[in-house]
Amino acid sequence: MWTRKSVLSLVCGALAATILPADQVTPSAWAAKHLVVPDGPQAGQLWNPDQTPQLIEIMDHLSPESPVNEVVLRKSAQLGATTLGIAWSGYVATVDPAPMMIVMPTLDSADGFNREKLNPAFEASPSVARRVMAAASRSARASTVRTKRFPGGSIILTGANSTADLRSKTRRYLSLDEIDDWPLDLDGQGDPQKLAYARKESYDATGDWKVLRASTPTIKGESRIDEAFEAGDQRYWEMPCPHCGGEQRFEWGTKDSAHGLKFRREFPHQAHYVCRHNGCVIHHHEKPAMIRAGRWVASCPGPGRYPSYHLDALSSLFAQWDSIVADFLESKDDPTRLKVF
């Protein structure tokens, strides 16, 4: 028999379910359950955090429950880090609706990102597809090629070469991608990165804005992402040696260093790693377990420093050390090719 108290309890429970805070699920947990990866080794499958464990902490700082406003990722190419921006976008569309902007180097690259990665991921992920308005609709609220609309917010895709978008849109969340490829000056109106930051000024008073900057570095001394990384707390993926347990990050060895990645210049390169603590020889087949046992450690913590992360090919589960060495030897005399490392 229904009583007034039981009915009231049921109604209150249903109401509470609609207004629970977003901390009920983190971005990484959401992605593992809902995000279908559009390309790469995991294409067509749910995102597997076990394949890129380094992204978990970075993703979760993009949750509204994290007090962090800024996150920086300095990365090598082809590490699966594109998933970071896609996952955050899907999370915003389904869990934490708000106005968001994704800024690529150019409008053309923004269109390519949407066509090849973001749109396929959204269409393949049912929870996102249900929330994002269809582009085919004639409604004024329909999505377009460069705008994803959903209840409570929208995601605008644009380029760092677009004066109109960088000067006119108010956004709570900004994902600034490949910032080293952005122009230094936009049509005489200044640094596009500063113009992008101005889009979130309306949220400065509430402090609930977030900015993700991610890029492969270009030329040393001229790199935006290097500067951003060094202004942060400079986190590296530290892993325990499988033989002595000493924590360390993977580094390239040199002729003067006893530790690091060692290899023959001739094929086969026989790449292996020498532990910095006890000189233990670590073989490639031991690398996956090391990476999965790793954690982010800040090398330069301090007041006012935001989380900044360094992720390179040596600690990627997708890359073979011998292949990395072969590519490095081909690229070592070309600074523009070396940036992928």
Question: For each of these PLM feature ranges, what is it?
Answer:
Residues 2-341:
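Phosphate/NTP-binding elements of NTP-utilizing enzymes
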